[in-house]
């Protein structure tokens, strides 16, 4: 560091980062720095470099030319001193109480203090602050830079380029402003503020508490304070107009990406809202807003009522207690908070509405947005999107493609589910839902009471969920698990059904209905019709199931199953079927390591199996007893889709292959009888046989 104040230093070599502290008061310094030769002589400083804590005072009647102020460098131009062609780089600071001309600001800061004058400043980036009593003339404000005019500061002839900002505080003065397209003016209508100039549309003024023809864009902002006004304001993308309590605006144009915020008790008349323009307001008493929305409809907020308000693109409306909103449209990124009453809101994609405790919503139409209900919502229509009933309640909701979620002690009453989903979460309750074409899903800790399950609808009761008082039609799909806490109801045929304490009784499964009988639980007298399925897990037991077009998958134990036309019982590895009765058109499939004993195979019934290891089968048919044990099949009857695969190293004896039946022998067989319409294959691969079995040419 070199500190020279009033002394002499010659032949100085100032390296990068070196600190020079000096002034022009009787000081003589000469040498070189990274920018070239520099000197201070006879009160004149030339080409001085200031950085890293370096400082230069230009004393009264002294001057500085081509000073460079870098990071952490500072220069003070004192009263009656002058500085010309100063360059202020990033992190540099210049304080002016005298005169500064032709300054270039490249990321640094210039402070024009009391009695200071700056002329011809070019702000490429960084900031020029005009303090009380300071003045700036003919300033160019480029993109990314800003000029700040404080109270009693003055800016004359400022040119704001696109991306640049002119910020005028209360009581600041800015005359002859040239506001180019894409530039930002930040100001207010407070006492003493005096601004005039030209923007892309016209001559504009902010003076005497009134703003006229102001254009706001690209972070530009005008605050209209109490007892002042603004007329003919244009709010473009990135611009914002704030209307405070007891302030007034007239003829505001709110364009796409602009924001009009009318605070409680503010007034905005003749608003012209274009698509994408954001309105922020409330229904607080004393607030007055009138105009046309982006759909061309008249809207208003007055006398504690909002009508036809459009909220989008960060727009929001707060409906306070004791007030109401009618026919609001909430588009993408619009928001509505209701503490009072709301009627007829349309929630489009990515719009949000919150109904708080003690508030009400009636006839909302949810089309991709989200409504959260802590209060009461009646007759909502959910076409897409979601309604979340979180501790509140709903009545007569119509779900036609969207989702209703009921949680946290929320309650949904008399919901009509045409398509879409009603999901009941922990501590949520749905009462009296009518399930026509969509789904009601009851999750752990949820409760559905008195649901009507019509043809085409699905009621899904999951582990630790509860559904009581169900009225089930013949084609209503019940999906349930024996891990459900409690399920009760009545089938279309009047039979009562239930699931309690791990036991399922008289369950009807059809049209996509599924009962999962979990390990260490049971089912009794399940009716599985077309499209239904019962899954009996390992260590689970199913007794008395009737399959009429449906399917039972046995991984545990199935007792006394009856398989009617179209029904299929599949015994998986380690599963066991006992006393299954297969009627005409029914099918029993026993896979490797499966077991089926005491079977009754009636005429026209199909048995599908093989002589694989672990398969054990026994039963009776019209020709007597039959069995498969120890890789030996005896007296098997194969017809109407039945088939037997005799594997290599195994044997079949006395088999009968009837019409529609098939047998493939890769091992040995004896006394096989093949009737008309039966298919016997010797020596083909297993894959070829299975392909034939799938075809209807057997």
List the predicted regions and their residue ranges.
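Long, low-complexity, polar and repeat-rich extracellular regions
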Residues: 1-698
């Amino acid at each position: 560091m070199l500190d020279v104040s009033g002394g002499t230093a010659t032949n100085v070599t100032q390296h990068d980062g070196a600190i020079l502290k000096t002034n022009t008061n009787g000081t003589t310094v000469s040498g070189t720095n990274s920018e070239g030769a520099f000197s201070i002589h006879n009160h004149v400083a030339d080409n001085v470099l200031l950085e890293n804590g370096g400082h230069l005072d230009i004393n009264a009647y002294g001057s500085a030319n081509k000073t460079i102020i870098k990071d952490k460098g500072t220069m003070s131009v004192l009263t009656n001193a002058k500085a010309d062609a100063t360059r202020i780089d990033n992190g540099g600071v210049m304080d002016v109480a005298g005169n500064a001309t032709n300054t270039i600001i490249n990321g640094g800061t210039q402070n024009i203090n009391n009695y200071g004058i700056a002329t011809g400043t070019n702000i490429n980036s960084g900031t020029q602050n005009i303090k009380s009593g300071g003045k700036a003339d003919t300033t160019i404000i480029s993109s990314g830079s800003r000029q700040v005019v404080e109270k009693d500061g003055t800016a004359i002839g400022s040119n704001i380029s696109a991306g640049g900002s002119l910020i005028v505080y209360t009581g600041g003065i800015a005359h002859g402003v040239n506001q180019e397209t894409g530039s930002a003016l930040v100001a207010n209508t407070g006492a003493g503020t005096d601004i005039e100039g030209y923007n892309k549309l016209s001559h504009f003024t902010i003076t005497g508490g009134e703003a006229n023809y102001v254009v706001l864009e690209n972070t530009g902002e005008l605050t209209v304070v109490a007892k002042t006004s603004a007329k003919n304001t244009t709010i473009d993308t990135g611009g914002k107009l704030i209307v405070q309590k007891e302030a007034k605006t007239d003829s505001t144009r709110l364009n796409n990406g602009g924001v009009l915020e009318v605070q409680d008790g503010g007034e905005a008349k003749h608003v012209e809202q274009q698509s994408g323009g954001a309105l922020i307001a409330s229904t607080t008493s004393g607030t007055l807003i009138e105009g046309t929305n982006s759909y061309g409809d008249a809207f208003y907020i007055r006398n504690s009522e909002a009508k036809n308000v459009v909220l989008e693109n960060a727009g929001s409306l707060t409906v306070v207690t004791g007030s109401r909103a009618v026919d609001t449209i909430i588009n993408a990124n619009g928001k509505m908070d209701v503490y009072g009453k709301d009627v007829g809101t349309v929630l489009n994609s990515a719009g949000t509405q919150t109904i708080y405790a003690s508030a009400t919503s009636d006839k909302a139409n949810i089309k991709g947005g989200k409504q959260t209900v802590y209060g009461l919502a009646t007759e909502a229509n959910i076409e897409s999107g979601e309604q979340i009933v979180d501790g509140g309640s709903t009545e007569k909701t119509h779900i036609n493609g969207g989702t209703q979620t009921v949680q946290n002690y929320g309650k949904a009453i008399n919901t009509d589910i045409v398509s879409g989903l009603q999901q009941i979460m922990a501590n949520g309750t749905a009462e009296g839902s009518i399930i026509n074409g969509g789904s009601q899903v009851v999750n752990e800790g949820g409760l559905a009471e008195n649901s009507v399950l019509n043809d085409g609808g699905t009621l899904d009761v999951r582990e630790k969920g509860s559904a009581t008082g169900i009225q089930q039609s013949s084609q209503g799909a019940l999906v349930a698990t024996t891990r459900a806490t409690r399920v009760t109801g009545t089938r279309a045929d009047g039979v009562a059904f239930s699931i309690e304490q791990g036991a399922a009784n008289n369950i009807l499964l059809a049209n996509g209905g599924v009962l999962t009988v979990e390990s260490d639980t049971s089912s009794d007298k399940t009716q599985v019709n077309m499209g239904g399925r019962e899954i009996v897990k390992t260590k689970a037991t199913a007794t008395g199931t009737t399959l009429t077009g449906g399917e039972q998958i046995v991984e545990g134990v199935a007792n006394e199953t009856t398989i009617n036309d179209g029904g299929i019982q599949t015994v998986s590895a380690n599963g066991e079927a006992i006393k299954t009765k297969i009627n005409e058109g029914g099918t029993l499939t026993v896979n490797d390591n499966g077991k089926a004993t005491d079977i009754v195979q009636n005429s026209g019934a199909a048995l599908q199996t093989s002589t694989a290891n672990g398969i054990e089968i026994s039963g009776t048919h019209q020709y007597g007893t039959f069995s498969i044990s120890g890789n030996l099949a005896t007296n098997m009857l194969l017809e109407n889709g039945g088939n037997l695969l005799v594997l290599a190293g195994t044997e079949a004896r006395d088999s009968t292959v009837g019409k529609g039946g098939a047998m493939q022998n890769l091992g040995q067989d004896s006394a096989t009888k093949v009737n008309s319409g039966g298919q016997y294959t010797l020596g083909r691969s297993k894959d070829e046989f299975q392909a034939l079995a799938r075809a209807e040419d057997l």
